[in-house]
């Protein structure tokens, strides 16, 4: 029994041992399995993650590789719709091509020239303008390259050559790569807009393909050890000394006269500029010679003023006037009082501000013997795009190297923009004497389309109109060309050929015209008598072309019968044997340049030419011109009727010496007894077609009046019409956009000197408005080209002006100009002490404006407008004349001794000035 119990117990123990031994490996295997499972799971996760990561990168690469191009409207490739005709398919393909090209051109223009992404509206406006063929692709590039924003970017990057570097710059020893330079962000938008910093993208990569690009914050950028601006700011200017004649000693800085004059003016200038903030010192750079018209020479002094400043570039308050990006003034700024503006340190002023301070100080102190109208600054920060080469000249250089140049000879040339053909302005040349036949007329005159090619002009920095200046101001000096009149125009003379040597200072040689223009003139060739005729240059007033038509000889008897009751009065004995010079004013160009030529006619059978249309006709080509008045004796512009034998004609110029007309005096027989009949014969011969018949009351009044006709228009002048929308304004092909405007300054008093264009007050006020308005308009109006101050009129001071733009601008020109000028009025009132009445702004585009309205002619003059050029000017009424730009005055007042032998000068309305003898009889003496 015990044995059985022991065996059972032993069996149980063995069973327990076997069971325990089995459980231990099971647990071990289970743990290992669990560990293996965990390991395999992690490997699987790692492999899955890796595979997922690789797939994402590959997927991004594949997407970039096979990414479709941007196409907002059409898909790429040749797509054909079944319902379209072949013509429609071609048109749609061309339209799509134009769209894609314009999109890429505009996009690249913004990226290359402005280095920024365009706004949706401006991008769409440019694309639309390109699609309408308003601009070609290269014109878009030129427009962007000449924009103020692009020029400012270039100026800043040329000025600051050193780029800032990152603090977290990667070492070349660790990476073996190149140093990474942070490209400076340039804000080219309006002042009120904040643009994010854009970094350059590698070529071939689109901006919207960059994902998760990290940028270095602005705070991490290292501080540039080189100051952004110099410690001193220099302002250089030149001005003409009024009572100082130039001598050879002034060209030598070591001469006693040079030192004495320099010390004198340096001390005077220093007293004026001491009150300016930040003023340090002033230096006299030198003296230049300026030759006047009368042969005398004046002295131009060049100064340089130094102002102290720090190295930080701070935006000044004057930026509200000179740089307004979006045609708006930041009205949030609190306007500064005059006292606070005085306390502003020069360290916070830009070059423009300092120039304004210098100009203001010189205008306030009138003690200096200088001509403030000739004040000129150099290196101005804001200039027209055509003059930008002067601003960067000497700073950007291109090494000139090539196979033909040695390394030792290689030079550096300044980077300049291509400029138009310029004319040597060393002296004004005017043809003194000329002789012509009608057959030569065809080679000299072309149609209206040809006149543009007969002018060679240089682009002005400040547009002027030289034709309105007196003759003595029109001659630049020969050695140092001054900038008093920066626009030089060589007029195309229609009837000019030289027959004797001309004086260099009084003659000009026009450019030859193409002989193909002879098709515009139909002539009957016949021999022409050639008589030397000196040209007379006047103070220029615009006149309409005159049509002289030969009359039938059958009317001679009728004219004699009408005039038989008029007897001959008493005149000087010398006048019976010689002809008084009579001036006939001819317009030798269709455009109103004011370059009028006065010639006198002695005897001619007919004057058969018409100027003023595209086709010129001549039927009686026998023309003879006789001698005219010397240039130095002609003071007034003159237009008179055809000559009369044995009579005195009231001329608007001094008496003609008998020596000037020997041929004319000897050519006519003495027929004193038939003087009245000769008048009728000459009237028939001259063929003057009158527009008005003499009233019956005039037959017994002792006045005989002759009128020339208005020009006969052969070809109707083209109508001027601008295409204006909310987003663009376009002129006709070959035309410019012109806008007239006037504004009224209420805190200025008008003086009579502002009528005279040659007065110092007029020039000073004109220059002041040019310096204020020109930079403001350039920086705010795209396509702006030229500003011209037309005149000043009474009413406080009313400034009438004219602006010229490119043929197309991407905005409504009337609304844009009105907005810009309103902002200018507000800014001028806050910072320039100019009270401009914004409600008085009158802005009219040329296609809607009346140019005569802005000329503001007085009661003794009338406005004449050229129908082709739409240019207007004031012309004195018959019997009145203007001298030195002053308002028109009566000839009887200007020349008290106009009539001889006790005759009385009277003005006949609409007829002119006549001399009435004491016995109530008079010869015709009509002038206009």
Swiss-Prot record:
InterPro entries: IMPG, SEA_dom, SEA_dom_sf. Abundantly expressed in the retina (at protein level). Localizes to the photoreceptor layer of the interphotoreceptor matrix of the retina (at protein level). Keywords: Cell projection, Extracellular matrix, Glycoprotein, Heparin-binding, Hyaluronic acid, Receptor, Repeat, Secreted, Sialic acid, Signal. Residues 29-49, 164-182, 466-477 have a biased composition (Basic and acidic residues). Residues 1-20 form the signal peptide. Highly glycosylated (N- and O-linked carbohydrates and sialic acid). It is found in: Cell projection, Cilium, Photoreceptor outer segment; Secreted, Extracellular space, Extracellular matrix, Interphotoreceptor matrix; Photoreceptor inner segment. A motif (Heparin- and hyaluronan-binding) lies at residues 785-793. SMART domains: SEA. Changing residue 785 to N: Reduces binding of hyaluronan and heparin. GO terms for biological process: visual perception. Changing residue 793 to S: Reduces binding of hyaluronan and heparin. This is Interphotoreceptor matrix proteoglycan 1. It comes from Gallus gallus. The lineage of its organism: Eukaryota, Metazoa, Chordata, Craniata, Vertebrata.
């Amino acid at each position: 029994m015990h044995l059985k119990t022991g065996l059972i117990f032993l069996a149980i123990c063995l069973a327990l041992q076997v069971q325990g031994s089995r459980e231990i490996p099971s647990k071990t295997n289970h743990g290992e399995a669990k560990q293996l499972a965990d390991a395999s799971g992690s490997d699987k996760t790692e492999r899955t993650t890796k595979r997922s990561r690789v797939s994402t990168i590959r997927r991004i690469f594949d997407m970039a590789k096979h990414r479709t191009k941007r196409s907002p409207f059409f898909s790429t490739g040749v797509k054909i719709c079944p319902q379209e005709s072949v013509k429609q398919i071609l048109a749609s393909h061309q339209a799509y091509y134009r769209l894609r090209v314009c999109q890429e051109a505009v996009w690249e223009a913004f990226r290359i020239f402005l280095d920024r992404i365009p706004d949706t509206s401006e991008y769409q406006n440019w694309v639309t303008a390109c699609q309408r063929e308003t601009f070609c692709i290269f014109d878009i590039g030129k427009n962007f390259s000449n924009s103020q924003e692009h020029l400012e970017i270039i100026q800043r990057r040329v000025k600051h050559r050193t780029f800032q570097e990152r603090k977290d710059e990667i070492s070349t020893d660790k990476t073996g790569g190149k140093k990474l330079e942070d490209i400076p962000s340039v804000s080219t938008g309006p002042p009120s807009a904040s643009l994010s910093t854009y970094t350059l993208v590698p070529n071939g990569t689109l901006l919207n393909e960059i994902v998760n690009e990290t940028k270095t914050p602005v705070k991490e950028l290292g501080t540039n050890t080189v100051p952004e601006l110099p410690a001193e700011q220099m302002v250089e200017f030149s001005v003409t000394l009024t009572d100082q004649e130039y001598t050879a000693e002034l060209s030598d800085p070591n001469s006693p006269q040079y030192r004495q004059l320099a010390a004198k003016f340096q001390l005077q200038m220093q007293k004026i500029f001491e009150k300016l903030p930040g003023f340090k010192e002033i230096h006299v750079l030198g003296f230049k010679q300026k030759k006047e018209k009368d042969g005398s020479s004046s002295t131009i002094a060049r100064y340089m003023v130094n102002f102290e400043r720090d190295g930080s570039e701070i935006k000044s308050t004057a930026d509200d006037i000179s740089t307004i990006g979006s045609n708006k003034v930041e009205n949030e700024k609190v306007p500064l009082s005059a006292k606070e503006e005085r306390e502003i340190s020069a360290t916070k002023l830009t070059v423009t501000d300092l120039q304004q301070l210098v100009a203001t100080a010189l205008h306030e102190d009138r003690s200096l013997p200088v001509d403030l109208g000739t004040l000129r600054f150099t290196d101005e920060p804001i200039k027209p795009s055509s003059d930008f080469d002067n601003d960067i000249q000497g700073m950007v250089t291109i090494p000139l190297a090539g196979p033909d140049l040695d390394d030792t000879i290689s030079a550096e040339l300044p980077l300049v923009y291509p400029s138009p053909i310029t004319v040597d302005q060393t002296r004004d040349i005017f043809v003194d004497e000329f002789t012509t036949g009608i057959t030569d007329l065809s080679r000299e005159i072309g149609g209206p389309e040809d006149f543009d090619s007969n002018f060679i002009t240089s682009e002005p920095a400040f547009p002027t109109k030289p034709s309105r200046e007196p003759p003595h101001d029109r001659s630049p000096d020969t050695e140092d060309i001054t900038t008093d009149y920066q626009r030089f125009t060589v007029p195309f003379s229609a009837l000019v050929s030289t027959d004797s040597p001309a004086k260099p200072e009084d003659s000009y040689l026009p450019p030859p015209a193409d002989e193909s223009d002879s098709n515009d003139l139909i002539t009957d060739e016949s021999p022409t008598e050639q008589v030397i005729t000196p040209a007379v240059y006047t103070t220029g007033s615009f006149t309409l072309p005159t049509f002289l038509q030969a009359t039938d000889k059958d009317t001679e008897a009728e004219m004699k019968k009408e005039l038989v009751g008029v007897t001959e009065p008493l005149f000087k004995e010398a006048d019976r044997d010689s002809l008084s010079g009579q001036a006939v004013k001819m317009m030798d160009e269709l455009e109103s340049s004011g370059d009028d030529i006065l010639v006198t006619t002695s005897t001619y059978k007919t004057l058969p030419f018409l100027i003023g249309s595209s086709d010129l006709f001549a039927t009686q080509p026998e023309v003879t011109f006789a001698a005219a008045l010397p240039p130095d004796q002609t003071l007034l512009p003159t237009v008179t009727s055809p000559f009369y034998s044995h009579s005195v004609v009231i001329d608007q110029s001094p008496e003609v010496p008998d020596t000037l007309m020997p041929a004319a005096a000897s050519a006519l027989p003495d027929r004193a007894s038939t003087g009245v009949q000769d008048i009728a014969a000459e009237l028939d011969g001259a063929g003057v077609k009158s527009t008005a018949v003499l009233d019956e009351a005039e037959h017994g009044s002792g006045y005989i009046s002759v009128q020339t006709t208005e020009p006969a228009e052969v070809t109707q002048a083209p109508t001027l019409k601008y295409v204006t929308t909310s987003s663009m304004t376009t002129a006709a092909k070959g035309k410019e956009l012109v806008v007239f405007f006037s504004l009224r300054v209420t805190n200025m008093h008008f003086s009579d000197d502002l009528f005279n264009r040659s007065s110092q007050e007029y020039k000073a006020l004109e220059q002041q408005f040019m310096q204020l308005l020109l930079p403001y308009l350039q920086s705010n109006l795209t396509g702006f080209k030229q500003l011209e101050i037309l005149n000043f009129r009474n009413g406080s001071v009313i400034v009438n002006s004219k602006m010229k733009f490119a043929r197309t601008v991407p905005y409504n020109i009337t609304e844009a100009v009105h907005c810009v000028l309103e902002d200018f009025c507000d800014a001028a009132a806050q910072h320039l002490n100019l009270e401009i009445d914004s409600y008085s702004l009158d802005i009219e585009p040329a296609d809607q404006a009346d140019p005569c309205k802005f000329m503001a002619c007085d009661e003794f003059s009338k406005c004449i407008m050229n129908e082709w050029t739409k240019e207007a000017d004031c012309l004195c009424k018959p019997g009145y004349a203007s001298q030195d730009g002053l308002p028109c005055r009566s000839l009887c007042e200007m020349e008290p001794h106009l009539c001889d032998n006790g005759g009385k000068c009277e003005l006949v309305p609409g007829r002119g000035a006549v001399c009435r003898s004491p016995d109530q009889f008079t010869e015709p003496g009509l002038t206009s």
